[in-house]
Amino acid sequence: KVVDLGSNSLHAENDKKEYVYKVSDYDYNLTKNYHDKGIHRYEINEAVLLADVVINIPKPKTHRLAGITGAMKNFVGITYEKASLPHRAIGDKESGTGDAYDKKSILKMYMEYIDNRQTICSVKGQIVMAKLLDFLKKSLYILGVLFSGDKYRIGSWYGNDTIWRTVVDLNHIVRYANKEGNICDLPQREILNIGDMIICGEKEGPVGPSPKP
């Protein structure tokens, strides 16, 4: 079910900046259908909306975009359409066009464009072209680092101002969206968070974390 937070979304604070949001391995035009000026929609699993109680069992670990995955970040799993989850804003922090990387760089700007073209080719099954674009993308990234000294990309750094807003939006939906997906003033269900912290994850999370007892 689609839940539209509209002006209640924390992303609405950046509407005037006209960000273009991106999710890795998804065409940014898909995400634009969910998040644009005045529109902030999320595809939410109806089972969550129909529940009276939600039991949330996260595995705490580091996260290269969000910093940490815990009880709040774990609610990213309530959506069945990842394209509706903004992870970064295309562009650089320095000029205010986005938060995917820090310093302004024409090379990285082209890298972002090629990254999206690669995604489209992969979806269409154009594997050879996708591999060529991947090589070109990585080459531009290396050149971008050499010229700007900025090693960051795809929002994977401490200056990411997008993913935390997505996380808070989803937590707001879990707490206040009723069974029809409408946002109410009062909480609509109870939430129990139980962290599985026997072994956590540190360093290169969330994909390749090191065990932390």
List where the protein language model places each region.
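Extended, low-polarity segments enriched in aliphatic/aromatic residues
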Residues: 1-213
